Every structure is written in structure tokens, then in C-alpha cells.
From Swiss-Prot:
Keywords: ATP-binding, Nucleotide-binding, Repeat. Residues 542-553 have a biased composition (Basic and acidic residues). Genetic data indicate it may be involved in ribosome assembly or function. Transmembrane segments: none annotated. This is Probable ATP-binding protein YheS. It comes from the Bacteria. Gene3D superfamilies: P-loop containing nucleotide triphosphate hydrolases. Belongs to the ABC transporter superfamily. ABCF family. YheS subfamily. ATP 1 binds at residues 34-41. The lineage of its organism: Bacteria, Pseudomonadati, Pseudomonadota, Gammaproteobacteria, Enterobacterales.
């Protein structure tokens, strides 16, 4: 089992965990939840032996095999399938030993190694690796492509598959759905439900957590609180605990007030001084109960749009694509106030293309898009985070939209999105991805849109912010079109589901459970097609055409690959600078008055590295998205 005992973890002068205690039994599947920045990822880093505890202890069996998702993937020439198989380290070691034994012609060693390979089911490893990759959205053709051919999002899927193929005793997953579409999320959920080891899962997706985990550890107020059951059960139990805590707090406050009243009345009287003194000591010894805080720190709503024209947007026989490649054909869509549409479809089918088309970021190849007079778009996509001005604060961004408004009104509004105190005037270059996403949403909400277009709006958002966004969208009066892998948000905010598939956009007759069945049926059909003989598959001309297309795609994507490689080197350098600064800041002696100048320099190095790293990461993300889109188009040709 894993035991955390009186654990203390600091980051510089900030305490993340203090005297925290928790236990995880073998085979348990634990959801690790809490606000962004509370220490969830730091706790996983502790288990991975990447950091040390500042106090207390933690233990788990030394024989346990750990697996986690690597965050970096070099541009390797190695085939995707072989890269994933590398995740089974014991298999690779035995494979190397077998090669050496064959070279020596050592029959005894060969027999022994074959026995070990049999014991770990080595002969099925290629099919197991292929199955993992298929589940995560890779085609048969992609299995043999080099890792360097894939964009960042797809490389993260390769890293995830590499972690899953490891025959681990303890699997650590930190937001594994961030780079996945809904199809892959559904597949991963099924895989994790059948996982036999111990799982610690960080996720802000309640629908993903619920069917998987049987325990929740909630990091709050520098402590770890344990709850048996899934996330929905945790919410009920926590509400009960907080209600009890509040009742105890109020009861204690009454007792404190009574004692204080006695002390104030009789302290000066000689006949009662002794009794008053005893009550003073009683107050001093009393362990005060904190009041319960259950409020969501985020609170906002969409103000009523200035107008609600009907229809807001109309499409007639619209086709869309990139260059000569048609992604969507003959789209017919009518959006009116109150339309609430969730887009479903496999990766690369064209969901984001449709959103861009609706937003006016992509011109139609043919057909007409009719926009109502008075339409006001609110468009959210991940690349918009880069449009924030790095040298400006949240209040400066908002003031440009509302130059006539009083500063206090702007501050009050931003407070609903979690920007309070100094955060309101802090430059966005220092912001995390979640903070930037919240600011972009705040700017959208302020403008009172009547048509909302949201492409994966919950990426980077924690559970509290997701809930606040969901509640605001439920009350939104205009039209909504959303792409999301967050099924709770889709269920709560949409009335109709549309399927983007085979160049078409059509109403889907069913719910999200029916969509899972549809995915399964399509996968079976494709597997049958793959197994069927194809007359031209091995023809010389087909191979020649395929090589030509691959060469053209490599040439087209080469500038982006070079830029991505440059950014990765820069991020590596900045990460090293940041690690160096944070290591120094972890030294308590650095905070002595005599080392004030050194501390200031160290803090400046930390801030500069964080700022540069954030800018590089956003540029890297944009380049990766462009590369991913080009590769998806190339694969479909």
C-alpha cells in the first residue's frame, strides 16, 4: 500500500501540503482532485522520485513497477508501434538478452529467456501495442510511421500508449484526456476500468472519473481528505462533512462568546478573578474549528444579448476545406436563438473545421452562409489564448473593451472569473494555461454574444470553473455550438447532437451512450475492411503514389517541424533555468536578510524563465495545431 504520513511539501516559501496524511490500498483506483495549484501534480512528482518531501514521509512497496506519461517526445525515426513497445522495459531487456544469447549460440540461456518471455506473454506484445494505438485513434498505416511524423498532440497519445503497455503495479496519470478527443476518452475510460493495478488519476472531467475511481483524495487547505466512492459520491460526502463542520463551528462560536462574556464581566472582580482566569486558559487551549467554505470561487453569467435575430445564421449547401481537399460537403444548418448543439465525430472528421467556418475564420469553398444583422459571435478556441497581450493585465484587456466603465466595476466582474487582488493587474505573460483560458472566457462573456462557438472550452479548467461555465451556459439565451470531450458539459448544456462524419453534418439520433455504440460499430466495420483483401493494395503504382504523397507532406510540413524543434530546444533551456531557480528557492537559508540580493535575483530568474516558457509553450501549441491539421488532411488524401 501507499502511505503518506504527516507529509509536508513546499514550493519556495509556499506550503502546498502540511501534515497531510492518506492511505491508498493495492488495487484501488484513486481520483486526486483539488483546485489548480493545490499540489496534485507535485504529489505525483514525489511518487516518481522527482522531488523530495520537506517533512513527514511516504512509503510504497519497493518492488512495484511504476508507469506514467512522459511529457517530452523527441522527433525519433523509430516507428510508432516500436516506440510504444519500449514502454514494456522488461520485454525490451529480455529481447536484448535473447539477441546476445543467439549470438553466443547459448542454448541454455535461450531456453531460459524464452521461458521468461512466455511468462510475460511477450508473443502478443505487438498486437497489444496495436490495440492500444487503435483505441487512441491511430490507423493501421500510422503504426509504422516514424514518431517524428506526428504532431505534439499525437506524440502525447504515443506516450500515453507507452505508459499503458507497461505491466505496472502503479499507474500515475495527470490529466490524460487533455490531448484526446471524445472517442479516445471513451476508449481510455473502458481500458482504465479493467486495469488491474493501483491507479492515481488527476482529472477535471467528472464523467471520466465517475466510472473509473473507487476513492477520492481531495487536496484542500494544505491537507488530504479521503472519501470512499466515485466523484459523485465524494460531492455528497463532502457537502455533509462541510455542513457538520459549519454546525460545529457555529456551536463552538457560541461557546467562545459565552466564555468571553464571562471573562469581560468578572475579570476585574476579585471574587471572580480566579474563575475568569480559568476560562481564559480554557479559551487558549481550545482548538478552534474553521468555518466551512463551500462556495465556488467562480461566479459569472451571460448578460442578455442586445438582440436575438431569428435565424442567427443559415447555411445552404456549404462546402469547406483546405486547398483542394474538401473536409465537409453540402452542409445545411439553421441556428436560431435557443439552438444548443453539441458536435460529435471522430478525430479529423471536421468538427473544428465547422466551428472555424461558423466563426468566419475559414471561408466556404462553395455555398452560402447567411448571417443575421445584429449577430454577435463569441468564439473560443485554444489558439485564442495566444492573442492575449503578454505585457497587459486582465483589467487592461477588459478596459480596452469597456473604456468608459469604472475600474471598480471591471474589478468586480473579473473577480467572478477568479482574478482578484494583485492578479487583476498582473501581466498575462506569467499566467498559466488555465488562467489565460479564464480570461479569454471573461472577455467573451463581457461582450454579450448571441451566438457562442466553443471548441474544447474546458481544457486547462479545473472542476470549479467547469461547473461555473456549465451553469452559465445553461442560462445562456442565444445559440450555442460546442465541441468538447467533457461529457458532463455536453449533457448539461446541449439539446441536440450533430454527427460530423464522412463529409456530412447531420443530426444524431441518440444520446452520448448511443454515440459510444456507434463508434464501436464503425470500428468493427473498419476492422473487417482492413482484413478483406484489396486488389490494388500491393500494386507498384499504389506504393509509388503513397510514397509521393508522403514526400509531399514532409516537404509541406518541414518549416513547421523546424520551428517546433527550435521551440522545444528553447523550452528545454528555460525549463533548466526554472529548475535551477526553484532549487535555490527551496533552500531556507536563501531567505536570510544577508542574502536578500541573491533572493531577488533568483526570483527574477524564476519569473523570467516562467514568462519565457509560457510564451514558448503557446507558440509551440499553435505550431503543433497547424501541423496536426496538415497531417490529418494528408492522411485523408
Amino acid at each position: 500500500m501507499i502511505v503518506f504520513s504527516s507529509l509536508q511539501i513546499r514550493r519556495g516559501v509556499r506550503v502546498l501540503l502540511d501534515n497531510a496524511t492518506a492511505t491508498i490500498n493495492p488495487g484501488q483506483k484513486v481520483g486526486l482532485v483539488g483546485k489548480n495549484g493545490c499540489g496534485k501534480s507535485t504529489l505525483l512528482a514525489l511518487l516518481k522520485n522527482e522531488i523530495s518531501a520537506d517533512g513527514g514521509s511516504y512509503t510504497f512497496p519497493g518492488s512495484w513497477q511504476l508507469a506514467w506519461v512522459n511529457q517530452e517526445t523527441p522527433a525519433l525515426p523509430q516507428a510508432a508501434l516500436e516506440y510504444v513497445i519500449d514502454g514494456d522495459r522488461e520485454y525490451r531487456q529480455l529481447e536484448a538478452q535473447l539477441h546476445d544469447a543467439n549470438e553466443r549460440n547459448d542454448g541454455h540461456a535461450i531456453a531460459t529467456i524464452h521461458g521468461k518471455l512466455d511468462a510475460i506473454d511477450a508473443w502478443s506484445i505487438r498486437s497489444r501495442a496495436a490495440s492500444l494505438l487503435h483505441g487512441l485513434g491511430f490507423s493501421n498505416e500510422q503504426l509504422e510511421r516514424p514518431v517524428s511524423d506526428f504532431s505534439g498532440g499525437w506524440r502525447m497519445r504515443l506516450n500515453l500508449a507507452q505508459a499503458l503497455i507497461c505491466r505496472s503495479d502503479l499507474l500515475l496519470l495527470d490529466e490524460p484526456t487533455n490531448h484526446l478527443d471524445l472517442d479516445a476518452v471513451i476508449w481510455l475510460e473502458k481500458w482504465l476500468k479493467s486495469y488491474q493495478g493501483t491507479l492515481i488519476l488527476i482529472s477535471h472531467d467528472r464523467d471520466f472519473l465517475d466510472p473509473i475511481v473507487d476513492k477520492i483524495i481531495h487536496i484542500e487547505q494544505q491537507s488530504m481528505f479521503e472519501y470512499t466512492g466515485n466523484y459523485s459520491s465524494f460531492e455528497v460526502q463532502r457537502a455533509t462533512r462541510l455542513a457538520q463542520q459549519q454546525a460545529m463551528y457555529e456551536s463552538q462560536q457560541e461557546r467562545v462568546a459565552h466564555l468571553q462574556s464571562y471573562i469581560d464581566r468578572f475579570r476585574a472582580k476579585a471574587t471572580k478573578a480566579k474563575q475568569a482566569q480559568s476560562r481564559i486558559k480554557m479559551l487558549e487551549r481550545m482548538e478552534l474549528i474553521a468555518p466551512a467554505h463551500v462556495d465556488n470561487p467562480f461566479r459569472f453569467s451571460f448578460r442578455a444579448p442586445e438582440s436575438l435575430p431569428n435565424p442567427l445564421l443559415k447555411m445552404e449547401k456549404v462546402s469547406a476545406g483546405y486547398g483542394d481537399r474538401i473536409i465537409l460537403d453540402s452542409i445545411k444548418l439553421n441556428l436560431v436563438p435557443g439552438s444548443r448543439i453539441g458536435l460529435l465525430g471522430r478525430n479529423g472528421a471536421g468538427k473544428s473545421t465547422l466551428i472555424k467556418l461558423l466563426a468566419g475564420e475559414l471561408a466556404p469553398v462553395s455555398g452560402e452562409i447567411g448571417l443575421a444583422k445584429g449577430i454577435k459571435l463569441g468564439y473560443f478556441a485554444q489558439h485564442q489564448l495566444e492573442y492575449l497581450r503578454a505585457d497587459e493585465s486582465p483589467i487592461q484587456h477588459l478596459a480596452r473593451l469597456a473604456p468608459q466603465e469604472l475600474e471598480q466595476k471591471l474589478r468586480d466582474y473579473l473577480g467572478g472569473f477568479g482574478f482578484q487582488g494583485d492578479k487583476v493587474t498582473e501581466e498575462t505573460r506569467r499566467f498559466s494555461g488555465g488562467e489565460k483560458a479564464r480570461l479569454v472566457l471573461a472577455l467573451i462573456v463581457w461582450q454579450r454574444p448571441n451566438l457562442l462557438l466553443l471548441d474544447e472550452p474546458t481544457n486547462h479548467l479545473d472542476l470549479d470553473m467547469r461547473q461555473a461555465l456549465t451553469e452559465a451556459l445553461i442560462e445562456f439565451e442565444g445559440a450555442l455550438v460546442v465541441v468538447s470531450h467533457d461529457r458532463h458539459l455536453l449533457r448539461s448544456t446541449t439539446d441536440d447532437l450533430y454527427l460530423v462524419h464522412d463529409r456530412k453534418v447531420e443530426p444524431f439520433d441518440g444520446d452520448l451512450e448511443d454515440y459510444q455504440q456507434w463508434l464501436s460499430d464503425v470500428q468493427k466495420q473498419e476492422n473487417q475492411t482492413d482484413e478483406a483483401p484489396k486488389e490494388n493494395a500491393n500494386s507498384a503504382q499504389a506504393r509509388k503514389d503513397q510514397k509521393r504523397r508522403e514526400a509531399e507532406l514532409r516537404a509541406q510540413t518541414q518549416p513547421l517541424r523546424k520551428e517546433i524543434a527550435r521551440l522545444e530546444k528553447e523550452m528545454e533551456k528555460l525549463n533548466a533555468q526554472l529548475a535551477q531557480a526553484e532549487e535555490k528557492l527551496g533552500d531556507s537559508e536563501l531567505y536570510d536578510q544577508s542574502r536578500k540580493a541573491e533572493l531577488t535575483a533568483c526570483l527574477q530568474q524564476q519569473a523570467s524563465a516562467k514568462s519565457g516558457l509560457e510564451e514558448c509553450e503557446m507558440a509551440w501549441l499553435e505550431a503543433q495545431e497547424q501541423l496536426e491539421q496538415m497531417l490529418l488532411e494528408g492522411q485523408s488524401n
